[in-house]
Amino acid sequence: MIAFQDAPGQLPDGHRVYAIGDIHGCADRLWELHAAIAEDLAARPTAHPLLVHVGDYVDRGPDSAGVVQRLAAGNPLPSVPTVNLMGNHERTMIDALDGAGASATDWMISGGREALTSWGGDPDAARTTWRAHVPDADMTFLRGLALRHQVGGYLFVHAGIRPGVTLSVQTDQDLLTIRNSFLYSEQDFGVVVVHGHTPRIAPEIRFNRIGIDTGAVFNGKLTCAVLEGCSVGFIQT
């Protein structure tokens, strides 16, 4: 049973959001979490469920390809709409496979070796050979990832937002990579930001944000925030 507590934001009646943090190639954990969400929905049906993945599907873990291909295949939960957001690791992977030399180096040192290997590629082979191992359908999925999604009083992004900057003009770089100036901000953003990117031992609930990266790939948990009405709970695998 999910233990709910007061949330800093609110969703309209009949709406429930399941938001999953950074996956990083931990495919088995993701399958288990999807199954747990399905069980919760069967026990507690709701009119308007939504599944959100906040990005960083690839790198570090053993099965980036499996994660991407599962999500690219369509809604993992039947009849539950799904929003897939981009993380900084997807952005780096895309740029690396498009031939950006600096991004290729960054990708390899931030977990890209494991990711490329999961697609059958050789990280030590010429960089010009890498792209051929990643199917076009997977690249199309990655390129089409959204940067943000808002429901009720919640804004879902990968990393966070720049305090003092209007939501409509936030830069891609900040949405994908921001840390301290967002994490330690005492500003009311006008929405509660649900984000990943910065791993913590447990989910973080602040008045202006909820952090759900709990370091699954670093022997932590894969976390799903369950948002409903004025409450929040968590499912972990």
Regions found by a protein language model. Give the residues of each.
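A general structural motif
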Residues: 14, 46-48, 79-81, 152, ...
